[in-house]
Amino acid sequence: NTEDCPSNVFVTANPLNKTSNILLANGNCSVGTSNTGTDEYISGTIAFGNGKYYWENKITSPGDPAIGIVPAEYNNNQIGNQRVMYHENGTIYSDGLGISSISTGVTYTSGDIISVAFDTENGIIKWYKNNTLVNNSTITNSQLEFSNKLWVPIFYCANGNGTATIQANFGNGYFGTTAVASAGTNASGNGIFEYDVP
């Protein structure tokens, strides 16, 4: 069963806006790469409107992953130019956006769940590792002018083995084909997530 339906549409990875070696599975919610040593990106299908948004990403295999947001206007040849991404090495990269990269000191690996909370009303993005806020991961509107652009999710991986590196849950309640273990609370009642939505 899926929560995604015509009256309740969730984001997926966008097969029309990706670099060439990205692999997709499970309704375009599992992302990986068949290549090694090249930067591979894919954006999400739906831009964030005015409101608060949350999604979860389970890391399922080594693959140099990073998760974040990118301006919706960019096509597959540009989505690496401006992006805000939390990388498995613990660094938040903000290439092309005029602020320095941020070292959080919090790495992640296979089995971890990385959540993203993006508040477009107040211009704040935060990352969580296994339901704990990542140190120094909060970026504000004054730094990146979130309110001046439309943004979509972005997934990055560089060293793939042909399997999914990231399994995203935008509200369907699944990581790949596995249901979330313990559905958290959600004030809007929209979607099923592993953890309580902050």
Regions found by a protein language model. Give the residues of each.
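PRY/SPRY (B30.2) beta-sandwich protein-interaction domains
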Residues: 1-198
